[in-house]
A protein has these predicted regions:
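Conserved active-site-adjacent core of cysteine acyl-enzyme catalytic domains
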Residues: 3-4, 8-10, 14-18, 67-233
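A short glycine/serine-rich beta->alpha loop
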Residues: 11-32
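N-terminal leader/capping segments at the start of a protein or of a new domain
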Residues: 32-37, 60
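Surface-exposed patches in mature extracellular/periplasmic domains of secreted proteins
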Residues: 51-60, 128-135
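Intrinsically disordered, low-complexity domain-flanking/linker segments in eukaryotic proteins
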Residues: 58, 63-69
Length: 234
């Protein structure tokens, strides 16, 4: 739980995305991290409460465009404070997650998405649901939510077995913006209504990171969005 777990990514649409890397858990020296679910919840909390947009870059951009001397510096400071506030909230979110699941969270167990709506509700983020929309219905469901400024949590099923949770916080006519907690990267993924959305994290990503807590994908592990989605309903 540190500032080094948060990364800011800028996409080709000039949008800024806050990506939180999942916690690293080792068992007998081996990486046993299965904390993508809680990391996705942390990202949704950050994005929904507008930590970055309301108190960070938007404010900084407004100050800069007004011609106030030092506007860029002020905007940067606000962005830093926004992330710091998100980090301060993490212990409470971990506690809520533990209370909802009934077991102490340590990041080594697989997440159950049916628990996510209650965790998000207890974070005062409204009413959420975990729904099956099918592989072909995922794009429309995700876009309907992100068009309102509300991110969703998507479930990726790996072709070789296993699964992964990611956050989608923006969608365009033929793409979705995927915030991946494993390597803290943002990926612009091709998508179309009625079609299964493939996800290949091994594809080349343009980004720049100075250190930080993040994982790297190893052998090729392509997959696709299964059709499960956690979204806000009220």
């Amino acid at each position: 739980m540190a500032l080094t777990s948060w990364f800011m990514r800028i996409d080709r649409y000039c949008s800024v995305h806050a990506v939180r890397s999942q916690d690293t858990v080792t068992v007998n020296g081996a990486d046993s991290s299965n904390s993508c679910g809680i990391a996705s919840i942390l990202m949704v909390n950050f994005k929904q409460k507008k930590h970055l947009m309301a108190a960070g870059l938007s404010a900084g951009a407004a100050i800069s465009s007004s011609g106030v001397p030092g506007g860029t510096y002020i905007g940067g400071q606000l962005s830093k404070l926004a992330v710091e506030q998100a980090v301060k909230e993490e212990p409470e979110i971990y506690k809520i997650y533990t209370d909802v699941t009934g077991s102490i969270y340590n990041g080594s167990a697989y997440s159950d998405a049916t628990n996510f709506p209650e965790v998000l509700r207890r974070l005062s983020l409204g009413t959420w649901s975990c729904d099956w929309v099918g592989p072909g219905g995922f794009f429309a469901a995700a876009k309907a939510s992100t068009d309102k400024g509300i991110p969703v949590i998507g479930h990726v099923a790996w072709s070789g077995g296993g699964a992964h949770f990611v956050v989608i916080d923006e969608a365009h006519s033929s793409t979705i913006s995927v915030c991946d907690p494993w390597d803290a990267e943002l990926r612009i993924v091709p998508a179309a209504a009625g079609a299964t959305i493939n996800y290949d994290p091994n594809a080349w990503v343009w980004s720049f990171s100075l250190g930080g807590n993040r994982h790297q994908y190893g052998s090729p592990s392509p997959g696709s969005f299964s059709g499960w989605i956690v979204r806000k309903t009220a």
